[in-house]
Design a protein with these regions (language model features):
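Short acidic loop-to-helix transition motifs that present clustered carboxylates
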Residues: 166-171
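Non-catalytic nucleic-acid-binding/docking modules located in mid-to-C-terminal regions
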Residues: 2-6, 24-36, 71, 208-332
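Noncatalytic, basic helical substrate-engagement surface that gates or grips nucleic-acid strands
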Residues: 3, 7, 12-17, 21, ...
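A polyampholytic, Gly/Pro-enriched intrinsically disordered region
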Residues: 182-190, 206-209, 222-225
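Acidic, metal-binding active-site segment of PIN/NYN-like and related structure-specific nucleases
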Residues: 172-200
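Conserved NTP-donor binding/palm subdomain of two-metal-ion nucleotidyltransferases/polymerases, i.e.
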Residues: 191-194, 198-199, 204-212, 216
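Short, hinge-like loop/turn segments at secondary-structure boundaries
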Residues: 93-96, 180-182, 201-204
């Protein structure tokens, strides 16, 4: 059987697994005013891609920043740097997928523009428009100009930002785990593999809410250590092992068998046990452990991060208004 090539962000089906196996003590909806006087870090690129896809980058970034500050939440926006070389193959595949989506979108647009839409049923027309919208989101690109616009807006608000050397997720996890921030706002499921203590997902600008994931509580309810959880997720397929022929459901089934093993084998690790008792692991154990190591924050040695104090600077309301007016935002 050919290995499945994984190109989606984060661990596939992890969110479903957590929701099915954890209680509201670990995963619950909260209003943002519950975070008053707390600091948060934001994995910025996720929201930039989303807001660009909605043709509302500056408007929604303005609303997000305003929402946090109006609830007395002190944010730090973390920007991605250069991806690690271990992701080169994945990034090539994603670029190809973007091109395919763009070609298909352009073909559909051309077809839609020449057909008589009155001959389509309401359902057919809706389905075609939905597919084009979905395709357009698949080839969204963030430009350097987009990044500079957002940074200028952050400066105008007096909000701090940090340029990561590599990707933002490990920096966000480090800042939360070290106690410099209370939680991370991100929809990337990799945050749990890093052991980020608290993650805020599905932030809603409309309902001023988010879903709070408490990682220590999650691990407690799953009866797993952070190390075991990370090993399970890495074996199930990450951005660093895209050719693996494994998945989360099967890995969990094998882990359940491992925990029910003969108690005389207490010193054997999960990977070692799998290697001896199955053909589920097809790669070298050392390679898997090296990937696990990539999902730790111990390699972060930036003195600026060690001494960082997340706080607000004075805001420039006239600059905020100028920037937003230039972006077409109408103040009421």
């Amino acid at each position: 059987m050919q290995p499945t090539i994984k190109t989606t962000m984060g661990i596939k089906n992890l969110n479903r697994f957590l929701k099915e196996n954890c209680t509201k003590k670990s995963i619950r909806k909260i209003q943002l005013n519950h975070l008053t006087n707390k600091t948060v870090v934001i994995d910025t690129s996720i929201y930039m891609y989303r807001y660009i896809a909605e043709n509302a980058l500056m408007e929604n970034m303005y609303l997000l920043i305003s929402l946090l500050l109006s609830n007395n939440i002190v944010p730090l926006f973390v920007f991605d740097g250069k991806p690690p070389i271990e992701k080169n193959e994945l990034l090539k595949l994603r670029r190809l997928e973007k091109k395919r989506a763009e070609y298909k979108y352009n073909d559909m647009i051309a077809e839609y523009n020449i057909i008589d839409t009155s001959t389509l049923s309401a359902d057919e027309n809706h389905k075609m428009l939905q597919e084009m919208s979905s395709l357009k989101k698949q080839f969204v690109r963030v430009t350097e100009n987009d990044i500079q616009q957002v940074k200028t807006l952050l400066n105008a608000y007096g909000v701090m930002y940090y340029d990561s050397i590599h990707e933002a997720d490990d920096v966000c996890a480090y800042l939360v785990k070290s106690g410099k921030a209370w939680a991370c706002i991100s929809d990337d499921m990799d945050m749990f593999v890093y052991g980020c203590t608290r993650v805020l997902r599905n932030i809603s600008l409309l309902h001023t809410s988010a879903i709070l994931y408490d990682t220590p509580c999650i691990l407690n309810e799953l009866c797993m250590t952070e190390r075991i959880f990370r090993e399970i997720m890495v074996l199930s397929g990450t951005d660093y092992n895209i050719h693996c022929n494994t998945n989360l459901d099967m890995t969990i089934k094998w882990y359940t068998k491992y925990t029910a093993r003969d108690v005389s084998l207490t010193n054997i690790t999960f990977y070692e046990w799998l290697h001896r008792n199955s053909d589920y692991i097809t790669t070298d154990i050392r390679e898997l452990l090296d990937i696990c190591d990539l999902f730790t924050t111990k390699h972060i040695q930036d003195k600026c991060l060690e001494n960082i104090e997340i706080k607000l600077a004075p805001r420039n309301d006239s600059l905020i208004r100028e920037l937003m007016t230039e972006s077409g935002f109408v103040f009421t």
